[in-house]
């Protein structure tokens, strides 16, 4: 059993005392609708940009999760006034005039990449930043390197290239830097969010391809909505950000498309029907490209003006290979439902997910193998063969990884007796995940 980092769990984690969950197959056809929580990606971007602005911004539909909790707590320690009232969050930005402080960022990858540049724009101040055990194993050097080129003073406190670290406020001079997005697009977004506060324009020359490049567009669109002046080509080879401070805004945040995919997969897997009440296909969140994957597997998808609906089929179709590079957070979702297809499914171009909260390729291969499913693991993906998963004697480990937990839970809606350790890890992005499953008729036992 893999121990989780309890310090990274926030008060917004609802399953603090729950060690395992057991899921049970549906007794009847799934036919329901849900309202999804807000987007984690948009929430943390909007919180930090609002804090960088001067005066009051309002966010509606903010996600309340571990990652957003640590973002809010860090911003408060920096002197930002934030008030969360139900679905509405007000932020009084201070233009980057941060208080010196020691900060803890939990396991929040977005916060780890976005906050660093925001601190670097300050003309004075000192900060030490600690991260969770898992986040401290994920490299930050690509972003630190370009921030140093632009004038930032950053020192690693233990291991070179990883959290924890300290930063001294020098401001950013501006200029041209080269940055790769092949490991994570968040390095690029982290620099972009800070760039309007540099002394001169910041030009980013992107080296190679960008994994999940749509998230960079998401960052750019949000920056522009807060008044940033940005120029870029559609291939994102060169991005220029001009010195223009953000202006306060009132923003309605979309629902989380990544979370949506688990519920769409649930309907696909159980020959059910589900309607997502607060998400449309017009979203720029890349994970919703999974809709075309579900259609490829035989499902019927309705893209409404205010909803998305999916209806499953009695036999999912397999027998294909697919690059999941642009929606790599859903590689595990597809792997989890792949055993129930009528042919093998090969997932490629996701080597970078080996460096997330867990080595996701290795972990999902291990779990499926334990369940009796044949898998072939390779450097940038895996092939999953059809089969009937069989419950294991001991609970499956979730490896303190929310995407592992949510993906494996789908199998539990088809196979009796599947148990998962540490279900509370879902609070990183969707604290209410298991409650939403129960709302849809899935029986969940908490132990």
Curated annotation (Swiss-Prot):
PANTHER family: AROM/DEHYDROQUINATE SYNTHASE, PENTAFUNCTIONAL AROM POLYPEPTIDE. Phosphoenolpyruvate binds at residues 40, 109, 138, 186, 360, 403, 428. It comes from Halalkalibacterium halodurans (strain ATCC BAA-125 / DSM 18197 / FERM 7344 / JCM 9153 / C-125). Pathway: Metabolic intermediate biosynthesis; chorismate biosynthesis; chorismate from D-erythrose 4-phosphate and phosphoenolpyruvate: step 6/7. The active site is at 329 (proton acceptor). Catalyzes the transfer of the enolpyruvyl moiety of phosphoenolpyruvate (PEP) to the 5-hydroxyl of shikimate-3-phosphate (S3P) to produce enolpyruvyl shikimate-3-phosphate and inorganic phosphate. Its main location: cytoplasm. It catalyses: 3-phosphoshikimate + phosphoenolpyruvate = 5-O-(1-carboxyvinyl)-3-phosphoshikimate + phosphate. One of its GO terms (biological process) is aromatic amino acid family biosynthetic process. It comes from the Bacteria. Belongs to the EPSP synthase family. Keywords: Amino-acid biosynthesis, Aromatic amino acid biosynthesis, Cytoplasm, Transferase. The keyword Metal-binding does not apply. Its EC number is 2.5.1.19. It is an enzyme of class 2 (transferase). GO terms for cellular component: cytoplasm. GO terms for molecular function: 3-phosphoshikimate 1-carboxyvinyltransferase activity. It is found in: Cytoplasm. Monomer. 3-phosphoshikimate binds at residues 40-41, 45, 184-186, 329, 356. The gene is aroA2. Pfam families: EPSP_synthase. This is 3-phosphoshikimate 1-carboxyvinyltransferase 2.
């Amino acid at each position: 059993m893999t121990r989780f980092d309890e310090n990274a769990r926030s008060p917004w984690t609802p399953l603090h005392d729950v060690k395992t969950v057991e899921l049970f197959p549906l007794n009847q056809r799934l036919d329901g609708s849900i309202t999804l929580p807000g987007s984690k990606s948009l929430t943390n971007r909007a919180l930090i940009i609002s804090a960088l602005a001067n005066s009051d911004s309002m966010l509606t539909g903010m996600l309340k999760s571990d990652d957003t909790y640590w973002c809010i707590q860090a911003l408060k320690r920096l002197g930002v006034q934030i008030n969360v009232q139900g679905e509405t969050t007000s932020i009084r930005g201070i233009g980057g005039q941060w208080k010196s402080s020691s900060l803890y960022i939990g396991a929040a990858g977005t916060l780890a990449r976005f906050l660093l540049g925001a601190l670097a724009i300050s003309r004075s101040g000192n900060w030490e930043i600690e991260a969770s055990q898992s986040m401290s194993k994920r490299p930050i050097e690509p972003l630190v390197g370009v921030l140093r080129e632009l004038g930032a003073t950053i020192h690693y406190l233990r291991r070179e290239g990883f959290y924890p670290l300290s930063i001294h406020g020098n401001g950013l001079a501006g200029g041209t830097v080269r940055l790769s997005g092949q490991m994570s697009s968040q390095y690029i977004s982290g620099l972009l969010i800070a760039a309007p506060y540099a002394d001169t324009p910041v030009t980013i020359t992107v080296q190679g391809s960008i994994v999940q490049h749509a998230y960079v567009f998401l960052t750019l669109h949000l920056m522009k909505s807060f008044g940033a002046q940005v120029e870029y080509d559609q291939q994102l080879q060169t991005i220029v950000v001009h010195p223009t401070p953000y202006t306060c805004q009132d923003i309605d945040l979309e629902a989380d498309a990544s979370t949506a995919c688990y519920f769409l997969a649930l309907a696909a897997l159980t020959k059910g029907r589900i309607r997502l009440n607060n998400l449309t296909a017009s979203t720029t969140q890349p994970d919703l490209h999974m809709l075309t994957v579900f259609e490829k597997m035989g499902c019927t998808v309705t893209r409404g003006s205010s909803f998305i609906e999916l209806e499953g089929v009695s036999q999912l179709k397999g027998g294909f290979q697919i690059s999941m590079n642009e929606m790599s957070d859903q590689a595990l979702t597809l792997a989890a439902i792949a055993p129930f297809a009528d042919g093998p499914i090969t997932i490629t171009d996701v080597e970078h997910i080996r460096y997330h909260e867990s080595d996701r390729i290795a972990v999902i291969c291990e779990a499926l193998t334990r369940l009796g499913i044949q898998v072939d693991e390779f450097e940038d993906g895996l092939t999953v063969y059809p089969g009937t998963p069989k419950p294991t004697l001991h609970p499956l480990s979730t490896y303190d990884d929310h995407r592992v937990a949510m993906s494996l839970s789908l199998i539990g809606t088809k196979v009796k007796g599947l148990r998962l350790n540490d279900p509370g890890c879902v609070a990183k992005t969707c604290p209410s995940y298991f409650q939403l499953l129960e709302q849809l008729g899935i029986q969940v036992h908490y132990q």
